[in-house]
């Protein structure tokens, strides 16, 4: 796809042509991608991450875009980026969906809703009544999906403009590892661009939990009931995210970390670290703080 083909019909001036294979944010490590940039800092970040093929930006930033990149100019690059992406999704640019494949040993119970296209269900999986599987969802062997769970939906990726709020259509996939259990009413979102949201093997996703777009979760990790994992987080293996905890976007929670129930995580958490509170701090510090408050009030 050429940059001009992607931008056709929109108020965008293509000044330098390029071939693109995907759209993506500057932080997303995808080769051949079109990015938007509203500042010189974002342009530098895109160059540092690599894989950029073309840049959609404002006219006054054009001279900061190297000759090796395609260049498109718009008054509102951010909005045009979203509009271009959403149209390409609707036109099937990110790939035609294949007929769904369900292993003969899998059990899809009556009342489950499985898209006729874009689904792969592995051996011995169990899909309960009321579960919903949207396109581009891949289940490895022995996965269990309990009633009311929704897999492969759009995550919460919305951009606000002066006159509108526009959702970014999700064009990636969701992959769930072997023997993982997704409990009742949990929601697992697919990725936004040509990437995957990945849940490892032997994980447990609790009742009513929400795992947003582009999240990566390692093996044997437990996401507690009602927990929220915001977009682009990386959660390691053998991690526990307690019930009702919230992990804000783009954080890394390393292997064996423990986030206690109801905590709000605003920073990365190291391997084996235990954090508590709103906002979450090392657990021992939180306990000391509570003891000090209690001693003052007694």
Predicted regions and their residues:
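Terminal amphipathic alpha-helical/low-complexity segments used for targeting or macromolecular assembly
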Residues: 1-105, 142, 148-149, 153-167, ...
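Structural signal for interior beta-strand "rungs" in well-ordered beta-sheet cores
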Residues: 36, 97, 101-282
């Amino acid at each position: 796809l050429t940059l001009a083909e992607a931008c056709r019909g929109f108020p965008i001036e293509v000044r330098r042509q390029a071939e693109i294979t995907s759209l993506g944010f500057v932080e997303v490590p995808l080769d051949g991608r079109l990015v938007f940039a509203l500042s010189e800092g974002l342009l530098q970040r895109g160059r540092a991450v690599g894989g950029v093929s073309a840049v959609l930006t404002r006219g006054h930033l054009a001279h900061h875009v190297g000759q090796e990149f395609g260049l498109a100019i718009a008054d509102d690059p951010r909005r045009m980026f979203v509009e271009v992406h959403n149209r390409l999704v609707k036109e099937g640019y990110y790939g035609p969906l294949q007929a769904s494949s369900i292993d003969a040993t899998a059990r899809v119970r009556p009342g489950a809703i499985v898209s006729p296209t874009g689904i792969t269900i592995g051996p011995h999986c169990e899909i309960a009544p009321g579960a919903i599987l949207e396109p581009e969802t891949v289940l490895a062997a022995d996965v269990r999906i309990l009633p009311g769970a929704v897999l492969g939906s759009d995550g919460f990726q919305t951009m606000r403009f002066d006159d509108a709020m526009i959702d970014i259509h999700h064009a990636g996939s969701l992959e769930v590892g072997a023997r993982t259990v997704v409990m009742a009413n949990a929601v697992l979102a697919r990725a936004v661009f040509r990437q995957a949201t990945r849940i490892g093997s032997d994980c447990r996703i609790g009742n009513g939990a929400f795992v947003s777009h582009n999240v990566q979760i390692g093996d044997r990790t437990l996401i507690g009931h009602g927990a929220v994992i915001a977009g682009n987080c990386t959660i390691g293996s053998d991690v526990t995210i307690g019930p009702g905890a919230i992990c804000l976007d783009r954080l890394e929670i390393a292997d064996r970390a423990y986030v206690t129930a109801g905590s709000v995580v605003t920073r990365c958490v190291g391997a084996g670290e235990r954090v508590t509170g709103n906002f979450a701090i090392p657990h021992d510090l939180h306990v000391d703080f509570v003891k000090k408050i209690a001693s003052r009030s007694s």
